[in-house]
UniProtKB/Swiss-Prot annotation:
Subcellular location field: Cell inner membrane
The protein's role, per its UniProt record: Heme chaperone required for the biogenesis of c-type cytochromes. Transiently binds heme delivered by CcmC and transfers the heme to apo-cytochromes in a process facilitated by CcmF and CcmH.
SUPFAM superfamilies cross-referenced by the UniProt entry: Heme chaperone CcmE (SSF82093)
TM stretches of this protein: 10-30
Name listed for the protein in its UniProt record: Cytochrome c-type biogenesis protein CcmE
Topology, Cytoplasmic side: 1-9
Organism in which the protein naturally occurs: Roseobacter denitrificans (strain ATCC 33942 / OCh 114) (Erythrobacter sp. (strain OCh 114))
One term of GO molecular function: heme binding
Length: 147
């Protein structure tokens, strides 16, 4: 009787371990496309990512760089005060998108141009990663809501 209880306990523990490993693997597999790493323009220029890598870029929209193309295609540049990366985006831009304002874009860096699939724009640091906000404030370039 004791051996039967011990064997049953071992089976339950083994089954629970297998279920835990399997669920962890499934969660990791499901999240692989949802994880986007953030980079500043200076980092992108120093070490260009592979064209297949999807990541986020953040900084300020460079003054005088917005060029509207045919249809919904927009070209502009993003800067962190040290580096400047050209960006193309096809779609409708957020209402708060304008020159000298913060933005974060999701996309890929292909042939020296960041091709954005999504653009977020905000007048304060809500969508801006802390590293970029600090870098821009250090250089006196950032114009946030704190005055």
């Amino acid at each position: 009787m004791k051996n039967l209880k011990k064997q049953r306990r071992i089976q339950v523990i083994a089954l629970a371990t297998v279920a835990l490993v399997l669920s962890t693997a499934l969660i990791g597999y499901a999240m692989r496309d949802g994880i986007n790493f953030f980079r500043a323009p200076t980092q992108i220029l120093a070490e260009p990512p592979a064209p297949t890598e999807v990541f986020r870029i953040g900084g300020l929209v460079e003054e005088g760089s917005i060029v509207r193309g045919q249809g919904e295609t927009i070209r502009f540049s993003v800067t962190d005060g040290n580096g400047v990366v050209p960006v193309t985006y096809t779609g409708v831009l957020p209402d708060l998108f304008e020159e000298n304002q913060g933005m974060v874009g999701t996309g890929s860096y292909i042939n020296g141009v960041f091709e954005a699939s999504e653009i977020l724009a905000k007048h304060d640091e809500t969508y801006m990663p802390a590293e970029v906000v600090d870098m821009l404030k250090e250089q006196g370039v950032y114009k946030g809501t704190e005055g």
